[in-house]
């Protein structure tokens, strides 16, 4: 690992189409400009790689003292802040720098709720369980495939089986935890495994296809016929068909970007029409 660079733009509120549809648009990234998970299809990577601003071997690290000062200025009624917007806040370098660990403690101190989004089983390590306040903590662990060997071909995160064990551990301990199936690629998911995960909640986000995505997944893209902006999506009826096969959870929500489908899931399907994340707010 080379010289550690400071990641300065650690907090932002997302606007545009995504921000308008997301109930929790404020993101706090403890690491940036690279992620050691280096998922080949990563949205952040696609934006930064061609500008030579993506360094998966040596991500930049946010200054925890600056983060603490920022958190202290937040109003007491701040909605949940998402930890891990552009990069994973529990990527392996967290074990070295512990910026996420200290950020969680700072958020707890100010009573600010937080939504952790990660592909890492580290979030379920005992040292993090000890500091996470169940009244403030919401956790989404992302799974893209149920096949450990397949996952190795496009991401360097914890194996799917490890993530599932982390989900089940956090569920058993009473945390507000969700399996985030994102992106949902039906060809990559064994429904018998998925539907037997011991977790109450699942959040599904279907694959959005552009020229970057088409490089990485060996699937039939001919079904992705609905175009919006620079992405192609599955038709709503096809999405409904795939969703109907997910049966092992008490609550299922869909995070959607395509406008017609967004309105359908919001008004006719999601348990909480105002919050597709379906967080358990105390």
Specify the residue positions occupied by each region the protein language model found.
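Conserved Radical SAM active-site core
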Residues: 1-138, 146-148
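Auxiliary Fe-S-binding modules of radical SAM enzymes
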Residues: 2-6, 191-282
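Conserved strand-turn element in the central/C-terminal portion of the radical SAM core barrel
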Residues: 156, 160, 166-189
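Active-site beta-loop-alpha junctions enriched in small/polar residues
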Residues: 86-88, 119-121, 142-146, 182-186, ...
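Surface-exposed cleft-lining segments at the edges of enzyme active sites
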Residues: 86-92, 148-157, 175-178
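Structural preference for beta-strand elements that scaffold enzyme active sites
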Residues: 80-82, 113-115, 136-140, 176-180, ...
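Surface-exposed amphipathic alpha-helices with a cationic face
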Residues: 108, 129-133, 164-174, 244-251
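A general structural detector for well-ordered alpha-helical segments in enzyme core domains, enriched
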Residues: 67-70, 99-103, 128, 159-167, ...
């Amino acid at each position: 690992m080379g010289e550690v660079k400071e990641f300065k733009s650690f907090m932002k509120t997302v606007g545009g189409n995504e921000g308008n549809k997301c109930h929790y648009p404020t993101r706090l990234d403890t690491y940036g400009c690279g992620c050691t998970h280096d998922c080949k299809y990563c949205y952040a990577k696609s934006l930064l790689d061609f500008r030579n601003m993506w360094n998966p071997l040596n991500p930049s690290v946010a200054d925890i003292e600056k983060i603490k000062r920022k958190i202290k200025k937040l109003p007491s009624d701040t909605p949940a802040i998402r930890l891990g917007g552009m990069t994973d806040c529990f990527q392996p370098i967290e074990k070295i720098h512990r910026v996420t660990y200290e950020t969680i403690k700072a958020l707890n101190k100010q009573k600010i709720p937080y939504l952790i989004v990660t592909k890492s089983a580290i979030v379920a390590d005992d040292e993090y369980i000890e500091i996470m306040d169940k009244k403030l903590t919401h956790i989404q662990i992302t799974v893209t495939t149920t096949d450990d060997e397949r996952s190795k071909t496009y991401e360097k995160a914890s194996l799917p089986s490890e993530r599932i064990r982390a989900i089940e551990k956090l569920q058993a301990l009473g945390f507000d935890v969700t399996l985030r199936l994102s992106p949902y690629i039906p060809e990559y998911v064994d429904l018998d495994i998925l539907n037997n995960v011991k977790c109450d909640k699942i959040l599904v986000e279907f694959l959005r296809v552009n020229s970057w995505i088409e490089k990485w997944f060996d699937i039939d893209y001919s079904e992705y016929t609905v175009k919006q902006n620079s992405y192609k999506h599955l038709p709503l009826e096809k999405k409904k068909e795939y969703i109907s096969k997910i049966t092992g959870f008490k609550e299922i929500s869909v995070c959607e970007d395509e406008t017609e489908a967004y309105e359908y899931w919001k008004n006719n399907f999601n348990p909480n029409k105002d919050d597709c994340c379906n967080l358990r707010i105390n």
